[in-house]
Amino acid sequence: MDVVEKVRNALGFNAERALPTPVHQLICDGLLFTEDHAEAWFTVGVQNLDTAAEAVWDESLDSVKKSMLQAVGESNCMIRIMWSEHRGEDYLRSVQGRYDASWGNGAAWARDYASKIDELHLPARTVMLGVNLGERTSGPARLMRKTEKAFGFQHGPVSDAELADAMVAARKILKVLAASPLAVELASVEAISWMLSRESGRAKARIPATGTVRGAALGHLLASKMVPHPDHVELFDEHDNLVAFKAILPIVSFPEELTAPGNADWVEVLSRITKIREVADGYGIRTEEVPVRADATIRFNNLSRQSAGKMVNEARRTAKEQRQSAAKGSAEEVPEEVEEAETANARLLTQIKKGGTFLVEQSSRVIVSASSLEELEENIDAVTHALGEEDIIVARGENEQRDLWLENLPGDALRVTDLNHIQTDNGFYGTFFWAGSRCGDEQAGMSGFVHGTTVEPFRSSISSAGERGDTTSTLYSGRSGRGKTTAMMLELLSDLVERPAWTVLFDWKGDTGGAALVARHYKIPASIVELGEEHSGAADMFRAFSRAQAPIAVQSMLMMQAKDRRQADVATSASLRFATEEAEEAEEPSTWGVIQRMAASNDADVQAFAAYLLDLAKTPIGRIVMGAPTANAGLSSEPGLWIVQAAGLSLPSPEISFSDWDAQQRLSVALIQGMTSFALGMSSSKALREMRKTVAVPEVHILLRATGGAAFLDQIARMGRAFNTSLVYDTQDCTSILSLPGLVEQLQGVRVFQLTTKAQQDAAAELLGLEPSEQTRARILALGRDETDIRKVAKGRALVRDWRDQVAEVQFTFPSRTVQELLSTDPNATKKKEEMES
């Protein structure tokens, strides 16, 4: 018998089809009452599993199975999986009061991102779980109530006592499931009302936000008309306008073998169904891939061990009888499938008796919507094909659309009962309807969106770690040209527009000056500080450290300048003594003073090294590092964004070993170390103590290769934590970072962009807290691939580890075209920047 015949035979008549439509009487937070029964409703959270290892999936599955069996037992339950879009107005409401009105124009930044949310049409998945709490009253009591109503004696639909009892039952379920990976919450009256309205033609009607919904308000919420057709339904609004077409497709066949995690997770398939659409533009007809969002409804109940054992034993006995009958009645071999069925049921019966497995009876429906019949057929084809690729077969449900549609209504019951499936607990809960992607801070500002099975705005605050007593360092790593520096600027700006803060961004390549333009665009004080002759001694280690700490830092810097073994010996043996003398004796100690002391030494080697250092101090970069100090430190202590640049820097490429660095490269790295240390020291000042402070340190991989580089980074990481100053690192080399356990321990966040070598990918995986594997390496490599055009490089896509150690894929995005142009490092954007600057 083929599938079509099975469906036709299955779609017969049964008593449940004749049930009257439900009469909804009251909705409140967590509860829905019909005339016959009460239901508890919960919103299901998202567990971040998209990037998790298989062991984490297994642990999550086991926990959910145990929790559901404990919380709901054999009660009739309903899962609703619904797709909508994130709305900019919801985002604006969530950040209301976050921006200091006396500081810049953070509200405009938030509005721009709200507009971006609407522009992107980000899909939002909502999963809700309903549990039938049982019949409200006995049959005679219901009949009496209907009789009284007919004679005009109208009582309140739900008494306070009944409401309280139902809430107690709901909270018992909540207590168990909230502590599970489902992380459920009582559904708000707004969420339940919205869920009901989706099955009517009133999708745009006002949804109550609080309180209870009953009487006329409830009637108004449900006021609509549904007209069934053989293979779809039409929905009309209260004005009798046709607003939507829907088709409810029952799932009639699952794969014979379900694995979890694996092919049991058909809910995940719903998140990635697409179709090809033709679009006319000025150049002719082109095609584009667009998503098809199909909802799903699953009605189910767990079966007790006794019921499940009886059912499986009956199936085993039937298979055994078939085998024996076939063996007696024919000389041919017994069909293989009969023997397999007997063996499989015997094995399952053993598992049930041991308590390791239970069964679930379920009926699954996929709901496809469209604004026209033509679009509906296209969407149905896309859904049917996508599920068919996973060996999941859906039927059109001919001549059953009315009953299938009613089934989707919360408060109704299973009507088409002959399409049920009996599955093991792993097979059913292996749908992982709670799995998705989640990352970031719920209350912070937006800088992109989480990209995975579930999609949501990515909200983060890299400058606020100290406020929760956390470590304060964040790492950005990836290949050049993949958007990591732009992402860093977006997150820095997102924090900076909230309230007065002090942010220093070192720009040694000269490509982040656009951040100052963006800051000024939103009325935030910002400036580019170009270090020059007037900043002599600005990067002096004596400016950055206390008298007790500075001598060692000066010694390390001078060791870096040594060009041969003799100078290195002097720097190692003598420079610390002279630096200590300078610290103890000079009124205003400086590296320049240390060099003068060395020049006055009686040791010829020390004199020769001092002469060399004096020559270096006369160069533009050398003057900033070790020249005679001036009062111009180059950095403002006022709140705002201060971008520090230095003309003439020569940064060594990764291919050049430290021993081959020339004098200019050594001085350049010394300048970076000195200015970074000075900025951190400045952040500890009394004037900045009460505000957020952030220092962004680029080219970390270069600093690590310098003399004492590892110790320097470890030191500034600890300084940042001590001074409650957030440190932001930018590097192309994950392996060198991973080799510093002290620095890794200070990381409260990691952003990894595309990397192409196995060593870098594995190091990045460990920094993210993921298991290095072929799958993880492929995921990191794919970050730079544009899914819509293989000829393009994807920019701004990263794997992000937040401070809760959640890891998800994030697409960083600009709030507006203006910000995109101002932050661009493309030479073609120069004109726009010049216009803004003027």
What are these regions (language model features)?
Residues 60-63, 67-73, 406-457, 510, ...:
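P-loop NTPase motor domains
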Residues 1-416:
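Extended, folded cores of ATP/NTP-driven motor/assembly subunits in large transport
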Residues 326, 455-456, 464-482, 487-492, ...:
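Conserved P-loop NTPase motor cores
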Residues 34, 119-120, 517-520, 738-744:
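Short glycine-biased active-site loop of nucleotidyltransferases that positions the nucleotide triphosphate
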Residues 49-55, 80-103, 107, 115-120, ...:
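Switch/coupling segment of Walker-type NTPase motor domains
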Residues 97-98, 202-271, 385, 389-473, ...:
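Phosphate-binding P-loop/Walker A region and its immediate neighborhood
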Residues 34, 47-49, 57-58, 63-71, ...:
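Glycine-rich phosphate-binding loop of nucleotide-binding enzymes
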Residues 551-590, 741-838:
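P-loop NTPase motor core of the ASCE superfamily
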